[in-house]
Amino acid sequence: MTGAVTSWPGAGAGRPPAQLPVPALELGEGPCWDAATGALYWIDGPPGRVHRLDVHGLHASWDVGQPVGAVFPRAGGGLLVAARDGFLALDTRTGAVELLAPVEADRPGNKLNDGACDRAGRLFAGTMAADESPGAGALYRLDADLTLTPLVTGVGISNGIGWSPDDRLMYYSDSLAYRVDVFDYDPATGAVSGRRPFTPVGGGPVMPDGLAVDAEGGVWVAHWGGSVLTRYDPAGRPDRAVRFPQANVTSCAFGGPGLDRLYVTTAGGAGGPAGGLFVLSPGVTGLPSYPFGG
């Protein structure tokens, strides 16, 4: 991989990424900006908690009773949570949880992990084995009518998903493949085709995790085990890197009224600090997080 990489302390002007004053996280994941309410959502995976930081800076959280992988606002209100048993509806007013769409009920060792919604409100998320067995997971599309369509099988750890600014490409990381791939994407139907490598990431204990795409087509990839968030240009060349105190950088999402902030989640590790939620000014605006249409 060629290309000059600018190593950033984080927020620009020599400032490191700012850690936000929210509860420590065991395995923070899945930040998602809700433009309709000006709130940021994220999850703590193993404890099964969904977190929110609202427009006034007030924190709230909900326990869904099982491990979770990601959270998405719903167009009609409330949240959709990717969890161990499938897709759950979470009523943030009452805390009530309902299983809307079971996933891989015949594979009790599997669980949903990361995901994202496209501009049309279709949700893409994948599974992984709890013991991280290679090839045990799959990638799915959940439509607004709750139709679940398998797209890719033989996945190791299904992780970050994002789209190019013109919606014609979909980026996808399978952590155990040590790379981010790219598909041709049909925004009219949600079909994917032509999977091919976009960029290798990591090796050994360092793996690609969640990702986000900016308005210039740059792909920001979290490195589990690498203490870093790296931006790759549209050709797959690394050009910026942001360092974090935790080894396990897990995911990122653009947010703020101008989509000019980048929120980053991390996880704790043996002998290191607990996971947290960070924010930085990346010097570029991002693409929005879209709500689930169902």
Predicted regions, residues:
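Loop/turn-rich, solvent-exposed surfaces of beta-rich toroidal or solenoidal domains
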Residues: R179, F183, P200-P234
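Hydrophobic alpha-helical segments and helix pairs
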Residues: G95-L151
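Blade-level signature of beta-propeller repeat domains, shared across WD40, Kelch, NHL, RCC1
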Residues: A253-G294
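A short beta-strand motif characteristic of beta-propeller blades
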Residues: P16-V22, G57-D63, E98-A105, L146-T153, ...
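Beta-rich, blade/repeat-based domains predominating
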Residues: P23-T37, V64-A83, D106-R122, L151-L169, ...
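A short loop-to-beta-strand structural motif that recurs across blades of beta-propeller domains
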Residues: R49-H51, G86-L88, G137-Y140, R179-D181, ...
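Conserved beta-strand positions in repeat-built beta-propeller and related beta-rich domains
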Residues: D34-A35, L40-P46, L80-D85, A125-S133, ...
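Short loop/turn segments immediately following beta-strands, especially the blade-tip
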Residues: F183-A191, S281-L287
